[in-house]
């Protein structure tokens, strides 16, 4: 698929089917996201896959707004940065998060 088409047809989903995402699918997504470039190749981004309903509910309450939909999701991938590995950890997280959104 062409990049232009991927960017033009990408969409956000806030309503989910009541079924699990296969572990293999989640692992492929994580592997692809972690292949994203990083500043000075520091690889400071960490991903945490959450499928536990109680943890998803807790995560959905971590912000005042904009995260409530997470409680109904079958899985979430949290993007975190290791401050000790790079002073540009936040930039690296943003790059990885962008790949995840595609």
Language model features by range: what are they?
Residues 1-102:
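Acidic, surface-exposed loops and disordered segments
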């Amino acid at each position: 698929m062409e990049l232009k088409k991927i960017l033009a047809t990408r969409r956000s989903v806030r309503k989910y089917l009541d079924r699990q995402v296969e572990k293999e699918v989640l692992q492929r997504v994580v592997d692809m996201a972690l292949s994203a470039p990083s500043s000075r190749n520091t690889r400071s981004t960490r991903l945490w896959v959450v499928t536990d309903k109680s943890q998803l509910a807790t995560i959905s309450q971590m912000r005042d707004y904009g995260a409530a939909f997470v409680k109904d999701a079958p899985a979430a991938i949290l993007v975190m940065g290791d401050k000790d590995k790079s002073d540009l950890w936040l930039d690296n997280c943003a790059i990885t998060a962008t790949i995840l959104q595609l």
